[in-house]
């Protein structure tokens, strides 16, 4: 039986039959009962008041949405973070827990967030009309998103700085400066005659070899020239560097220009933000695999350390990387999907993005470790582990060091590499920043989108200044650990629990069937209701039990830093109970216990945003409920006659 008019959005309708995940037709719906009619009448009165609401802007076409999801999910996490994470957690063996985590946590969470955004046409806060008491999940995710935005933008500033200086005739990090007495050139050995070093300085460096640890010019350039690193922040973090401040400002100008008109502007930019990095990545891949030593680097990356599979930390890091890479749990996926038409085919998009994300991570890892293999070959270092650095050091020390050793036009490859990183970073921050702007515009309908985008961009720039100080990398490490990773993780657990355990798996699956015209397969049901939440809870508990004080450059943070970090985590995590208590205090229904129970029931605002679609949804839900009631009654009646038959048979 067709569900005519079910998918009406923006004045159009899609009256296709409900088709299962394996192509089977949905069961025929029973006629609407009197109870359903009464419910429909009540809902009609409620949605009539919504008729005057301005309709939500939609993507220009479905491809813009797909490109936007690719631009945020296929980002810095694939090229910068994944290779090092894989290398640290068993190399090729890490791919096994990562792929398992992807299928049991990553894909289910990604698809669920797409569904929630598209079904409600609301951002990460407003979707919680499904379980109003859980609105703090949305606000907590917004807090974590703000934390991530601030330090992500500082990485953009560093990338832009390196991009600008890459246009010089000689890469500035490729040679030693006179004051660096413990320096070794990053340029190829045959180019040393072109270095701006005096013979006395070279002699001094040679004399120091046995007593002082030598450092590459790329490392000293990053630490002493670019970030002017402080090794101790007990006396403060210092003042912002003017060059990095300028780069930070330019980065935020670009971000604002991309998001100023919402999806109308960011959707067009998404084509470039999503596709251009692949062009550069393939160019770098072709160049990288032809370098001497590239094979050793790739083998080092892919060679499995099977013993690591039994290490719980590896599984924890696989989950963290999956969240970081796919951008789930922080709001962008919900936000992007909220601008879709109600009947958009998100199942296909979710599968494309999550698969492409994994393939890109592998591609990025092979490319990067091929380059690092060449670096080890040029330095005559057998263990590639000795040339690999973590964190920002991987992007701004190891990579530049390797690129400076390219024999042919290293400036070109440097420009391509850092421009690719800049584009990847812009794609990620555009999504994160748009999430915050959408939350504010959903809450305050009269606010102009571009004004909110401008105000939040200014705030983002001002907050980002703390990271371009000499002690900025300390703050980045602290905020990422306490304000980003763990806050996102614990709130993602509550997000999943609120939808599938409190709202209910059956209710949620009915909503998906209504919107997508396809039944929810057993795989999704089992993951959402059991595997995904249980695995996340176990891993979070393990992380909390085994947590250790964080370090930067092998140095522990001062006590005040750890206190500030836990305070940051507390602010993010506390959004959940605080907003729950606030909701109960503002919506009292009888006793405290009754108000508590009421906070777990969907509010009148829950459902499709389009009034006509909402009417059809209520009819569909009531028909589904009637079908289940009839089936249950028939089942009981059948059991009764079966027992009666057995009884009569036993007495004859």
UniProtKB/Swiss-Prot annotation:
Q: Which GO terms describe its molecular function?
A: amino acid:sodium symporter activity; D-amino acid transmembrane transporter activity; L-amino acid transmembrane transporter activity; neutral L-amino acid transmembrane transporter activity
- UniProt lists compositionally biased (Basic and acidic residues) regions at 43-54
Q: State the UniProt keywords alphabetically.
A: Amino-acid transport, Glycoprotein, Ion transport, Membrane, Sodium, Sodium transport, Symport, Transmembrane, Transmembrane helix, Transport
Indicate, by first and last residue, each region the UniProt record lists as having compositional bias (Polar residues): 7-16
Question: Where does the protein end up?
Answer: Membrane
- Record's bilayer topology term: Multi-pass membrane protein
The entry's family comment says: Belongs to the sodium:neurotransmitter symporter (SNF) (TC 2.A.22) family.
Q: What is this protein called?
A: Sodium-dependent nutrient amino acid transporter 1
User: What is the originating organism of this protein?
Assistant: Drosophila persimilis (Fruit fly)
């Amino acid at each position: 039986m067709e569900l005519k008019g079910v998918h009406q959005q923006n004045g159009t309708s899609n009256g296709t039959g409900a088709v299962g995940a394996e192509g089977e037709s949905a069961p025929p719906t029973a006629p609407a009962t009197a109870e359903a009619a009464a419910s429909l009448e009540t809902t009609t009165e409620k949605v009539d008041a919504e008729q005057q609401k301005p309709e939500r802007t939609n993507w220009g076409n479905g491809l813009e949405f797909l490109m936007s999801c690719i631009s945020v999910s296929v980002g810095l996490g694939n090229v910068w973070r994944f290779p090092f994470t894989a290398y640290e957690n068993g190399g090729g063996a890490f791919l096994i827990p990562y792929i398992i985590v992807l299928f049991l946590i990553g894909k289910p969470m990604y698809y669920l967030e797409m569904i929630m955004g598209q079904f409600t046409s609301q951002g990460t806060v407003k979707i919680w009309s499904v379980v109003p008491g859980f609105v703090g999940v949305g606000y907590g995710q917004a807090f974590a998103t703000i934390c991530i935005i601030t330090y992500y933008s500082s990485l953009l500033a560093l990338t832009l700085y390196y991009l600008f200086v890459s246009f010089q005739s000689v890469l500035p990090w490729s040679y030693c400066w006179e004051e660096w007495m413990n320096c070794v050139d990053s340029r190829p050995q045959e180019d040393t005659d072109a270095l701006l070093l005096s013979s006395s300085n070279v002699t001094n460096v040679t004399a120091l070899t046995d007593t002082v640890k030598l450092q590459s010019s790329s490392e000293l350039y990053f630490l002493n020239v670019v970030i002017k690193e402080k090794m101790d922040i007990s006396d403060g973090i210092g003042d912002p560097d003017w060059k990095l401040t300028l780069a930070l400002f330019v980065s935020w100008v670009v971000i604002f220009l991309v998001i100023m008109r919402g999806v109308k502007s960011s959707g067009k930019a998404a084509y470039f933000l999503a596709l251009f990095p692949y062009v550069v990545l393939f160019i770098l891949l072709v160049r990288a695999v032809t370098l001497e030593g590239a094979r050793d680097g790739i083998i080092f990356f892919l060679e499995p350390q099977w013993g690591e599979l039994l290490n719980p930390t590896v599984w924890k890091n696989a989950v963290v990387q999956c969240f970081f890479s796919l951008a789930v749990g922080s709001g962008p996926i919900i936000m992007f999907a909220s601008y879709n038409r109600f009947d958009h085919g998100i199942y296909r998009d979710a599968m494309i993005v999550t698969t492409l994300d994994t393939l890109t991570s592998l591609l990025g890892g092979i490319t990067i470790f091929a380059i690092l293999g060449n670096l080890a070959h040029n330095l005559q270092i057998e263990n590639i582990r000795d040339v690999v650095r973590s964190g920002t050091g991987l992007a701004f020390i190891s990579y530049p060091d390797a690129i400076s050793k390219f024999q042919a036009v290293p400036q070109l490859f440097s420009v391509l590499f850092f421009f690719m990183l800049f584009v990847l970073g812009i794609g990620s921050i555009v999504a994160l920043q748009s999430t915050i702007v959408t939350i504010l515009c959903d809450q305050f309908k009269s606010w102009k989108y571009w004004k909110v985008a401008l105000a939040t961009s200014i705030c983002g720039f001002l907050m980002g200044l703390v990271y371009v100080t000499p002690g900025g990398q300390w703050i980045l490490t602290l905020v990422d650990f306490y304000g980003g990773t763990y806050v996102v993780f614990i709130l993602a657990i509550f997000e999943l629990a609120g939808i599938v355990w409190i709202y209910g798996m059956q209710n949620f699956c009915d909503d998906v069937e209504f919107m997508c015209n396809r039944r929810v397969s057993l795989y999704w049901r089992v993951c959402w209701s059991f595997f995904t939440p249980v695995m996340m809870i176990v891993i979070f508990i393990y992380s909390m039990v085994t947590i250790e004080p964080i370090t930067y450059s092998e140095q522990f943070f001062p006590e005040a830093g750890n206190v500030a970090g836990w305070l940051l985590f507390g602010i993010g995590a506390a959004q959940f109970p605080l907003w729950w208590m606030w909701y109960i205090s503002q919506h009292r229904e009888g006793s405290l216990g009754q108000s508590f129970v009421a906070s777990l029931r969907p509010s009148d605002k829950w459902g499709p945003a389009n009034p006509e679609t909402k009417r059809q949804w209520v009819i569909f839900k009531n028909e589904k409920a009637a079908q289940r009631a009839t089936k249950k009654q028939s089942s009981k009646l059948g059991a009764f006659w079966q027992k009666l038959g057995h009884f009569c048979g036993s007495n004859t």
